[in-house]
Amino acid sequence: MRDPRKHPVPGDVLTRFGTTREVTAINRNDRGTVTHVVYGHPTTDTPQKEATISSWRAWTKLDAMVVREGAA
């Protein structure tokens, strides 16, 4: 079973401390390794943001709640 906190895919929605993020895209390097996560807020029209996979995993560490899982 995939954990969206560690292995995000487009469509995943996570929340932590009142902040909600929806994964919109995943950037990979030439070898296929995930390097960056592009995310935004699921209901407001705010600019998309890009985070490294390590900062994404640090943000979701332990206390982030999965609201919705995207199709893997």
Regions found by a protein language model. Give the residues of each.
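Short structural boundary motif marking the start of a folded domain
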Residues: 8-12, 35
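Short coil-to-beta-strand transition motifs
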Residues: 12-22
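A generic structural signal for short, solvent-exposed coil/turn residues
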Residues: 6, 15, 29-31
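Intrinsically disordered, low-complexity, charged/polar segments
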Residues: 43-72
